[in-house]
Amino acid sequence: MSFEYPQDFRYLDSHEYVRIDGEIATIGITEFAVHELGDIVFLELPEIGDALTRGENFGTIESVKAVEELNSPVTGTVIERNEALINSPEEVSEDPYGEGWFLKVRVNDPGEIEDALTADEYRAQVEGE
């Protein structure tokens, strides 16, 4: 199966992505993660105003196959969460890089994502799995 790897995103080896626009980060999970999870049935996300710390858990995603922790690629404060996904978590599967985003975060340091995986590095990791 062929997956999409947007070039303007950075990736964690745990399959979360981050896209930075100024000081705002959009966070979600990759198309590969969606494929591996299968049918998504539950999503737990932090509240607006909650603090995230890079590398630490910020929520949970549950599918018919597994329950996975979600890891933050950035440190900052949640300014928006995708409420539509709380009620209909299966929508993540339809458009993980677009309408299936999880959180928008005001980041403390936009440069901290520089050591996250590039699209090419992430692709190499996924194709090696």
UniProtKB/Swiss-Prot annotation:
GO cellular component: cytosol; glycine cleavage complex
Keyword Signal: no
Name of the protein in its database record: Glycine cleavage system H protein
Gene3D superfamilies, per database record: 2.40.50.100
Cofactor(s) in the UniProt record: (R)-lipoate
Domain Lipoyl-binding: 24-106
One of the protein's GO biological processes: glycine decarboxylation via glycine cleavage system
Coiled-coil annotated spans: none
Subunit structure: The glycine cleavage system is composed of four proteins: P, T, L and H.
Matching InterPro entries: 2-oxoA_DH_lipoyl-BS, Biotin_lipoyl, GCV_H, GCV_H/Fam206, GCV_H_sub, Single_hybrid_motif
